[in-house]
Amino acid sequence: MTTTEAMAPSTEIRDTVLEFYRRMLAGESDEANDLISRDPAMIFIGSAGEWVDDQDALRSGTQVPNEGLEAGPNPVAYANGDVGWFVDQPHWLFADGSRAEMRMSAVLQREAPGWRIVHAHLSVAVPDDQCVMLQRRWKYGIPAVAPGS
């Protein structure tokens, strides 16, 4: 398929993902799940081994109220036809009030009920110089700091 049209900004996609955030923070698990595609190609990827391509597994959890994503300063979305994407630098809010800076990208497709998330990748940015040590720590239990330092 050759496309000659450029991607265009999409407030519909942006609003869909921001509504997904809102539903998560409100603890509305079923309603948030309604914005996730049931397409067999659906996959959600997170940090440290989170790779979910099973619909039942993805939808089985419940969202804790006041825990979830808060939009970053400039979420952006684009579309071309029935496919589009979204990127953001949101914060993950924890129920205890703490927060973590995240990065998120998502692919959405237009379905009968509207735009639905078919892929999302959410992760914590780790500086390159710390990445290898952290991966070793997670995989092998190696301390993040050398003994005696």
What label would you give each PLM region?
Residues E5, E12, I43, S47, ...:
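Surface-exposed, charged secondary-structure patches
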Residues A77-G84, L108-R116:
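A short, structured loop/turn motif at beta-sheet edges
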Residues E111, H119-S149:
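Low-complexity, intrinsically disordered terminal/linker segments enriched in charged
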Residues M1-R38, R136-S149:
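Short, low-complexity N-terminal intrinsically disordered segments enriched in polar/charged residues
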Residues E50, S98, G114-R116:
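Residue-level signal for well-ordered, solvent-exposed loop/turn and beta-edge residues enriched
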Residues I36, P90-W92, H121-V124:
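Short beta-strand segments enriched in hydrophobic/aromatic residues
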Residues I36, F44, S60, D128, ...:
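Outer-membrane beta-barrel domain signature
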